[in-house]
Amino acid sequence: MAQQKRKKIIRSFLFSATTVIFFFGFVELVFRFSGFEPVFQYKAYAIPSWMEELDPVVLEKYQQFVAGQGFVNEDVYAYEADLRYGYKLKPNISITVRNYSSAYVVDKLPPWTVVSNTKGFRVSSSGEAKTEEKSLHVLGDSSSFGWGVDYEKTYSSLLVEKLNASASSSSDHFELRNLSLPGFSSFQGTLLWQELGEVKNGDWVILSFGWNDSFPSYQTDRQQFESRNSLMGKINWNLRQILFFRWMRTWRLPESGLEYKAGSRVPLTQYRENLEALVEGVREKGAKPVLVSVCNFAEYQDTARQIAGNKNIPFFNFPSSLEPFLPTVHDRFPDQFVTYFEAYGEGMEADPMLVFLFPDRCHPNEIGHGLMAEVLFETFKRKTR
């Protein structure tokens, strides 16, 4: 009798457990097939849940930025969590971004499109480029990613066009491999480099990090990576990839007002070590490194400049290197000049740098990318002869 009762209890338990598993599995399938994207609320704004992977101080500053500009920029929905890098572009996506800059000009700036490949990196809207003898690899942050402009208008894409147009033979043609992502630091650059096996003799590698390295944070990028890839970190991370679980996590209010000691995502000494290691790694493969600083200030810019001098490699500092072009921009880029002048109006007269920058005074716009390509091309042309 007792044994029969025990069997009944076990059957009841198994039935209940199976029902629960089936229910949650069904909900998970519905979420995934419907394209459901969990979000958490900050004031009146819905922020995609993958951003929970960010350092809490970085996330808090983004929330404050959103509240200040009055909307969540559409491009943040192009990303997903990634165990190695924290996040990457969703694979095989195509998204057109319309609201992405200052609220004062959000309806006046042209839209731009983000297209990714199977590995979660940005590519041309026409698909992967054909294989050439040489490659230009770009490891950088949002400016090298081309935030705010189409892929074909980024400085690296325009640079490859110029190099190939001036090449004496097809063996001197380059293909572009842009592995840059917004928010990436030199630490994530070293992680990228460890997986970058296609670099070969005669290639060029642009390294462009600094702004995100110096950004305030609660933990360093290295600490974030080690925590995420510890045993418990991997368990928690894999749980967060279950949409139903991630959706339930969004019910709690996000933390705010975090107290933290002053620190940066990548301390200056680590920044130096990362850049030096990247430069040496490029040279070991027979490729040619170039350091490009965009919106990289103070001691981080000085460090990048010193490394370039010590290693005897080209160094470019943007946007200051573009200032000499200000008097001729309207002749070089007449259509784009009109577009941005109509967007900024008197603001461009008060701040001429808006001719080639977005309102954040940091990211290059289409004109800025065009000028950067011209400046870089002159150096590349001399070095490739």
Predicted segments with their positions:
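Conserved SGNH/GDSL esterase-like catalytic core that processes O-acyl groups on lipids
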Residues: 102-122, 135-137, 143-234
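Membrane/wall-proximal cationic-aromatic binding patches
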Residues: 39-162, 341-344, 351-352
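N-terminal Lys/Arg-rich, disordered targeting/topogenic segments
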Residues: 1-10
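Generic structural signal for small/hydrophobic residues in well-ordered secondary structure
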Residues: 28, 141, 189, 205, ...
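Solvent-exposed, polar/charged alpha-helical surfaces in well-ordered, non-transmembrane soluble domains
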Residues: 157, 161, 187, 191, ...
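Serine-dependent acyl-ester chemistry module
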Residues: 7, 40-65, 210-348, 355-359
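Hydrophobic membrane-insertion alpha-helices, especially the h-region
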Residues: 14-30
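Histidine-centered active-site loop/cap adjacent to the catalytic His
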Residues: 15, 35, 338-385
